[in-house]
Amino acid sequence: MINAKTTEEVALGIRRRVFEHSIRNNGGYLSQACSAADQLAWLYNEELRLGEPTLPMIPKSFAGVPSATNRDYHTGAGYNGPPEPQCDRLIIAPAHYALAAYATLIEVGRMAAEGLEMFNRDGSSVEMIGAEHSPGMEVHNGTLGIGLSTGAGLAWGRRRRGEPGRVWVFMSDGEIQEGQTWEAVQTAAYHGIDNLYAIVDVNGQQCDGAMSTVMGVGDIKAKFEVFGACAVEIDGHDVEAMRQAAKTSHPGKPLIIVAHTSPYRGMSPLKSRFPRLHYVRFKSERERAQMSSAIAAELGVAPIEYTP
């Protein structure tokens, strides 16, 4: 599926869309779009080998879990195309990045903009915290750390079947604090699962504040290497650096791209709130109006109209 937009245009569109949504709803996962927009844009617009979407452009309501009376159940992976052997698969590990992920699907033409109007509504599959039935999601990742494990298992199975398609995992740095992440890396390295790729959004902040004050993780690249992975460290806002990192030779090892980012990239007024940026809710109508005006100017759009 070819997109006429440049990756930089897609990334800007992601930030604009998440910003507009957050202003209208008096809050949202803004910082995740700031830090991850370039990575998600690059994955969907350039790196991933995906087929045409197999699900409706406007997502259907959640019909319930698989059962005898719900045989048409499907995951949200259909927005990434069919699971053909030659196609890549994407696991979005941090489920709270869902808003940024939906905005990405819209910007690359895999979901209609109207789908975002269903965000976080009762009965909607467009969940605030993405689940396996949410657009672009293939598995449930409510437990941080499980995404890389799932990706490793999927990649191992694909290799056993001789499928040429790769498995990509998009991760957040908070998951580095989870022991399951390191078990997955060690297992993938031991079994030589080199069709497993991951990019880690290292934005230095999490729900309880700055990573360094919650539980510092030290040299992430060095740790991945000690556990047997091939790791490359880059500026996570540099698209060319991502392109080159993905070309790194890594026979017999998973490839991990450690992408250092800013949680207020493109929305610098948010810097005053750091590190309390995990979920941005405006403290007053005055702050909301000020943020709307200042960030809109930085993103090159008009201030967002909203109902107080």
Q: What does each of the following model-derived ranges do?
A:
Residues M1-I14:
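N-terminal hydrophobic or amphipathic helices/low-complexity stretches enriched
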Residues A11, Y29, P94, Q177, ...:
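Charged, low-complexity surface patches
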Residues A11-G27, D201-N203:
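N-terminal capping segment at the start of a domain
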Residues H21, C34-Y190:
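Cofactor-binding active-site loop characterized by glycine-rich and histidine/acidic residues
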Residues N26-C34:
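Structural motif
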Residues S31, I91, I256-V258:
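A structural signal for short, well-ordered beta-strand segments and their strand-loop junctions
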Residues G78-Y79, C87, S125-P308:
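Glycine-rich ThDP/TPP pyrophosphate-binding loop and its adjacent helix/strand module
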